[in-house]
C-alpha cells in the first residue's frame, strides 16, 4: 500500500505488509522523493538523521556518510550521545574533566606488573574485544593469556562484580575468580557500602582526597546518613544487593590493602540513573587514592578497541567529515521552536510525544514532530 500511496497510505497496516522487492533505482528515487516532500512541506524539524555503530573502516562510516549526504540536501534534526555510553559520557566530564569512556586505558604490561587485585565491574573483556571501532587485530588477547597465568599462580586476584558468570570469568577459571553476584540494578548501594566501610574503618586516603579532589565533604553526610537517617553501611546494602554484609566489608578491605585496578564496563550505566554508578566508580577510586599509580585507579574502556595494548606512534587516518562546505539544496534552518538535536535514544519519544520537553545534559530539549527518520549503521 505504501508503494502506491506513500504518506497517504493506511497506517493501520503498518507492520503487517509483506516485503516487496524493488530495484535500487526505484528505492533511491522513492527515498529522495520523500526527502524532498518532507523538507519542503514540514522543514528540517520533521527530518531525523540518526546512526548507530559503524561498519569497520574509515570510508564505510555509516554516521559520517549519512550526515554528509543529508547535509548536501538540507538541514535536519541531529542526535547527541550514543547508545553505548549515554549516561557515563554525560556525567564523567563533570567529575573527572573528560568523557573517559573512550580514553586510552593503562597498558596491560603495567597492570600485570603492578596490580594485585583487579575488579571487573560489569565488564566482560573476552567477549567484547571481539569487535572493534577500527579493524580488530585482537592483540590484547595475548595479555589476557598472561593475566590467566598470573591468576592461576595466585599473583593477581580477579573479582567479578556481575549478576552472571561472564565469558572472562569462565576463561580465567571459576575456581580462581571471586564472584560478587550483585542483584541487578543494585550496584550503587554496593558502592556506597564499600565507601562507608573505607571511611568508617579509616582505610581511605585522606591526603589524596585533600590534594586532588573536591566535594567529598558534600558527599559524606549522605554516606553517613546524616540527612536521611540511614547510614549506607554494609548491613543496609545487604538487603538490597543480596551480598552478605561481611563479604562487602571484606571486599573494601581487600581493595584498600594493595594495588587495585577497577575495570568498569558500560552495561551498568545503561540502567535507570546509571550515571550514579559511573560517578561512584570514581569516588571509590579516589578514596583508595590510587588514581595515577601504575596498576591502580579506574578505567571505563578496557573491553573496547584493544584497550590496554601499548599504543603505536604511527599516524591514524581520520575519517570523512559529516559536514560539507557545499551549499545545500534547501537552506531552510527554521526548526519552528523545536530542538535541532535530541538524545539518540529518544527518537521514539519524539514520534509518540512531539513537543514534549525533556531534560538532557543540563538543558531542556523540545522534541520535534518527526515525519521522516533516516537511519544508517544501526538496528
Locate predicted features.
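Conserved thiamine diphosphate
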Residues: 111-114, 118-124, 175, 219-241
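Conserved short loop/turn motifs at secondary-structure junctions
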Residues: 50-58, 236-240, 265-273, 304-306, ...
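Long hydrophobic segments that form regular secondary structure
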Residues: 247, 366-373
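Gly/Pro-rich turn-and-neighbor structural signature
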Residues: 43-44, 61, 243-244, 249, ...
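N-terminal export/assembly segments and adjacent metallocofactor-ligating motifs
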Residues: 1-203, 332-333, 347, 363, ...
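Flexible, glycine/charged-enriched surface loops at secondary-structure junctions
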Residues: 42-46, 204-209, 292-299
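A glycine-rich, hydrophobic/aromatic-adjacent loop/helix-cap motif
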Residues: 255-361, 366
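Scaffold signal of the M16-like zinc-metallopeptidase fold and its non-catalytic homologs
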Residues: 196, 201-234, 335
Amino acid at each position: 500500500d505504501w508503494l502506491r500511496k506513500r504518506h497517504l497510505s493506511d497506517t493501520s497496516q503498518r507492520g503487517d505488509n509483506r516485503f516487496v522487492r524493488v530495484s535500487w533505482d526505484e528505492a533511491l528515487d522513492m527515498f529522495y522523493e520523500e526527502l524532498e516532500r518532507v523538507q519542503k512541506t514540514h522543514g528540517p524539524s520533521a527530518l531525523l538523521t540518526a546512526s548507530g555503530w559503524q561498519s569497520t573502516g574509515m570510508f564505510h562510516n555509516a554516521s559520517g556518510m549519512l550526515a554528509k549526504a543529508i547535509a548536501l540536501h538540507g538541514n535536519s534534526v541531529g542526535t547527541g550521545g550514543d547508545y553505548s555510553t549515554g549516561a557515563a559520557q554525560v556525567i564523567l566530564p563533570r567529575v573527572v574533566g573528560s568523557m573517559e569512556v573512550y580514553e586510552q586505558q593503562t597498558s596491560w604490561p603495567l597492570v600485570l606488573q603492578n596490580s594485585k587485585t583487579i575488579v571487573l565491574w560489569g565488564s566482560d573483556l573476552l567477549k567484547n574485544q571481539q569487535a572493534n571501532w577500527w579493524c580488530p587485530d585482537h592483540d590484547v588477547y595475548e595479555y589476557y593469556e598472561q593475566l590467566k597465568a598470573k591468576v592461576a599462580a595466585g599473583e593477581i586476584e580477579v573479582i567479578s562484580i556481575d549478576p552472571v558468570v561472564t565469558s572472562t570469568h569462565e576463561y580465567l577459571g571459576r575456581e580462581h575468580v571471586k564472584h560478587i553476584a550483585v542483584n541487578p540494578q543494585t550496584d550503587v548501594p554496593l558502592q556506597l557500602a564499600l565507601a562507608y566501610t573505607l571511611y568508617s574503618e579509616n582505610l581511605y586516603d585522606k591526603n589524596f582526597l585533600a590534594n586532588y579532589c573536591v566535594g567529598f565533604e558534600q558527599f559524606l553526610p549522605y554516606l553517613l546518613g546524616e540527612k536521611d537517617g540511614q547510614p549506607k553501611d554494609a548491613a543496609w546494602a545487604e538487603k538490597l544487593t543480596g551480598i552478605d554484609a561481611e563479604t562487602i566489608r571484606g571486599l573494601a578491605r581487600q581493595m584498600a590493602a594493595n594495588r587495585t585496578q577497577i575495570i568498569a564496563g558500560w552495561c551498568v550505566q545503561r540502567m535507570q540513573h546509571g550515571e550514579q554508578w559511573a560517578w561512584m566508580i570514581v569516588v571509590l577510586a579516589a578514596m583508595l587514592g590510587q588514581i595515577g599509580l601504575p596498576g591502580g585507579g579506574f578505567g571505563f574502556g578496557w573491553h573496547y578497541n584493544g584497550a590496554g595494548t601499548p599504543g603505536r606512534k604511527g599516524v591514524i587516518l581520520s575519517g570523512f567529515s559529516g559536514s560539507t562546505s557545499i551549499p545545500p539544496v534547501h537552506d531552510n534552518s527554521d526548526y519552528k521552536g523545536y530542538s535541532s538535536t535530541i538524545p539518540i535514544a529518544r527518537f521514539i519519544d519524539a514520534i509518540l510525544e512531539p513537543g514534549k520537553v525533556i531534560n538532557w545534559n543540563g538543558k531542556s530539549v523540545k522534541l520535534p514532530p518527526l515525519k521522516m527518520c533516516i537511519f544508517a549503521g544501526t538496528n
